[in-house]
Swiss-Prot record:
Top enzyme category: translocase
Annotated residues for binding of ATP: G32, P33, S34, G35, A36, G37, K38, S39
Entry's family note: Belongs to the ABC transporter superfamily. Thiamine importer (TC 3.A.1.19.1) family.
EC number(s) reported in the record: 7.6.2.15
Induction of synthesis: Expression is repressed by thiamine.
Protein name, per record: Thiamine import ATP-binding protein ThiQ
Membrane association type: Peripheral membrane protein
Phenotype of gene-disrupted mutants: Insertions in thiBPQ cause a defect in the transport of both thiamine and TPP.
Function according to Swiss-Prot or TrEMBL: Part of the ABC transporter complex ThiBPQ involved in thiamine import. Responsible for energy coupling to the transport system. Is also involved in thiamine pyrophosphate (TPP) transport.
Organism of this sequence: Salmonella typhimurium (strain LT2 / SGSC1412 / ATCC 700720)
Subunit (UniProt): The complex is composed of two ATP-binding proteins (ThiQ), two transmembrane proteins (ThiP) and a solute-binding protein (ThiB).
């Protein structure tokens, strides 16, 4: 589904270079120290950064130079990027039509995702009238209503309390399984990664330093465990 072949981003004197393959429906966590290049990797996939070289394939098609708005990708950030002057209904509708002129089918999709997110009763409220968790549900609904096959999460739930964060992670995981979406999620928490992603990638110094089973990473047995401050449980 998603393949990066020597995708290179020139960051000062440190070229970041990524080679990666992710299958359709796979849920993958991206971990690593601060400044390692995790968000850069997502931004290259989303098209917000243009690589100096390399190839990016999605579903077999070359999207290396495709503008972000035309890529089969949706991305959710820690900052939800909701428009404060638009209500929930309108913010979700932007995912379908930037002009907010929706036909009957699009309105049905908008209302269906709002119901699935549990925010159908909030449709006329402005973002400033919502809690942090509710705002992230709206932002996630706007991503999902676009029905793109790849979903990118850049620590969107890190500011939420642990119980709400776990609830949102479970919701995302369930929807991805239901729709067979390919998910890549940047996180600073290996525990969060373990809840949603059987496979993890560790990024260090602009490279993929390790990839494998999240459980192995969490146990401290992986070669990259020490990069994340995880010690082996074996005495």
């Amino acid at each position: 589904m998603l393949k990066l072949i020597d995708i290179t981003w020139l960051y000062h004197h440190l070229p970041m270079r990524f080679t990666l393959a992710v299958e359709r429906g796979e849920q993958v966590a991206i971990l690593g120290p601060s400044g390692a290049g995790k968000s850069t990797l997502l931004n290259l996939i989303a098209g917000f950064l243009a690589p100096a070289s390399g190839t990016l394939l999605i579903a077999g098609d070359d999207h290396t130079l495709t503008p972000p708005s035309r890529r089969p990708v949706s991305m959710l950030f820690q900052e939800n990027n909701l428009f404060s002057h638009l209500n929930v209904q309108q913010n979700i509708g932007l995912g379908l039509n930037p002009g907010l002129t929706l036909n009957a089918s699009q309105r049905e999709k908008r209302d269906a995702i709002a119901h699935q997110m549990g925010i159908e009763s909030l449709m006329t409220r402005l973002p400033g009238e919502l809690s942090g968790g509710q705002r992230q549900r709206v932002a996630l609904a706007r991503c999902l209503v676009r029905e793109q096959p790849v979903l990118l999460l850049d620590e969107p739930f890190s500011a939420l309390d642990p119980a709400l964060r776990q609830e949102m992670l479970t919701l995302v995981s369930d929807i991805c399984r239901e729709r067979q979406l390919t998910l890549l999620m940047v996180s600073h928490s290996v525990e969060d990664a373990a809840r949603i992603a059987p496979r993890s990638i560790v990024v260090a110094d602009g490279r993929i330093a390790w990839q494998g089973k999240t459980d192995e990473l969490l146990s401290g047995q992986a070669s990259a465990s020490a990069l994340l401050g995880i010690k082996s449980h074996i005495l």
